Amino acid sequence: MIQVLNLGHVDYTTAQQLQTTLVDLRKRGVIQDTLLLLEHSPVITMGRNAKQKNIVASQEILAQRGVELIECDRGGDVTFHGPGQLVGYPIFDLRSLNPKIGVIEYVRRIEEVLIRSCGDLGIPTTRVEGLTGVWTVNEPQAKIAAIGVHISRAVTSHGFALNVTTDLDYFKLIVPCGISDKPVTSMQHELGKSLTLEEVMPVITRNFGFIFKEQVLWLESLNDLLPTPEDLPARAPETLRRLHEDDLHLG
C-alpha cells in the first residue's frame, strides 16, 4: 500500500523536517510507504555532490528574486524548486517491496513513473544514458524532471521534481544538476498549454501504483498520516507541529 498526501504549498525547510519525521516513523513501522506531493516557494537546493560554481547568480540576485539557498542530504548537484513544479517525496521502505530493490532500481522506477506519466499527458520522454532524470525525446533533448534521493537504512526520502508550469527563467540562476549542455523544459512549454498540478497528480499517483505494484490510498490530510500529535518527536520543529495542528483544525 502506498499512502498519498497532497500537502499543497510547503516551504522547503518544513518539508525537510516533515520528511525526517516520516522517515523515522517508517523505520519503526508506524506508517506505511507514503508519497508526499507538494509545491515549494522558490529555492535552490545543493545536494551532497553540489559544486558552488554551478550557482551562477550572486547572493544579491537571489535575494532580489526571492530565492532561498539551502543545502540538503539528497544525492546530486544543484537544482531549483518553485511554483508550478510538482515535487514528490516518496518515504518508502525498500525492504518492504516484493521483491526488495536497491537504490539504482529504485531511481529507475521513479524515472519510469515519470516517463509513463508524461506520455499519458501527451509528452514523449526518455532516459539519457549516464544521466539521472527524465528528458524529452525531440532534439534538443531537454530535462523535464529531476531526481535526487537519500536512503537511510533502506528508507527513502527526497525524490523528484517535475516541471509543469515552472518559470524556466529561474534555471538561468544555476547550472541545473551540473549539466551545462542540455536545456530545461516544462510540460507547459512542450504542450503549448497550461496544466494544473492537480491534473498531473492523479496520473503520477496511478503510475506509482502500477510501477511499484502497490495499491494507492489518498489521504485527506496530515492528520490521517499522523493520527495524534504524540506521533511527532518530542522536540519536533514548531513549523511541523503547526502544519499538523492546521490539519487538525481543518478536520
UniProtKB/Swiss-Prot annotation:
Active-site residues, as the UniProt record annotates them: 177
Protein name (database record): Octanoyltransferase
A cellular component term, taken from the record's GO annotations: cytoplasm
Lineage: Bacteria, Pseudomonadati, Acidobacteriota, Terriglobia, Terriglobales
EC numbers for this chain: 2.3.1.181
Annotated metabolic or biological route of this protein: Protein modification; protein lipoylation via endogenous pathway; protein N(6)-(lipoyl)lysine from octanoyl-[acyl-carrier-protein]: step 1/2
UniProt organism field: Koribacter versatilis (strain Ellin345)
Similarity comment: Belongs to the LipB family.
Entry's Gene Ontology BP terms: protein modification process
Domain of life: Bacteria
Ranges of residues in domain BPL/LPL catalytic: 29-216
Catalytic activity: octanoyl-[ACP] + L-lysyl-[protein] = N(6)-octanoyl-L-lysyl-[protein] + holo-[ACP] + H(+)
Keywords, sorted A to Z: Acyltransferase, Cytoplasm, Transferase
Keyword set includes Cytoplasm: yes
NCBIfam families assigned: lipB (TIGR00214), PRK14345.1 (NF010925)
GO MF: lipoyl(octanoyl) transferase activity
InterPro entries assigned to the protein according to its UniProt record, in alphabetical order: aa-tRNA-synth_II/BPL/LPL (IPR045864), BPL_LPL_catalytic (IPR004143), Octanoyltransferase (IPR000544), Octanoyltransferase_CS (IPR020605)
Function according to Swiss-Prot or TrEMBL: Catalyzes the transfer of endogenously produced octanoic acid from octanoyl-acyl-carrier-protein onto the lipoyl domains of lipoate-dependent enzymes. Lipoyl-ACP can also act as a substrate although octanoyl-ACP is likely to be the physiological substrate.
Sites where the protein binds substrate: 74-81, 146-148, 159-161
Misc remark: In the reaction, the free carboxyl group of octanoic acid is attached via an amide linkage to the epsilon-amino group of a specific lysine residue of lipoyl domains of lipoate-dependent enzymes.
Site note Lowers pKa of active site Cys, residues: 143
Compartment(s) of residence: Cytoplasm
